[in-house]
């Protein structure tokens, strides 16, 4: 199964490295749109001002999976559309994620197994929130219910 991960990011250096590390082994392709939406442009921003671009430029990509589109966007949906023309023709699924999402390998593997067994057109995943690091869980969906499909 070939999965493209699509990400939008602007000033997202907090867990961007961990996000990329968590999905890279499972990706056929990673498509990233980096840049501000209109609100941030109106505040004078033209690109990320934290370490986002440094992380993107230096992330190890030995398999040439990553495509980065830099730009300024009207809204987030336009930012997503900016990377779509770069998606390979042989991709089975696109997994949209935010730059602050980190996945455990067992969760990605479980979802891939489900997708291989059934041909779903849309799948949602549960989330949980952390504060100050991955040790401090502050909320999210009930983790005991291990149900990825909606």
Q: Model-derived features: where do they sit?
A:
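Conserved catalytic core of nucleotide-sugar-dependent glycosyltransferases
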Residues: 84, 104-150
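Short, well-formed alpha-helical segments that are part of the catalytic scaffolds
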Residues: 12-40
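Cell-envelope/extracellular polymer assembly enzymes that use nucleotide-activated donors
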Residues: 2-4
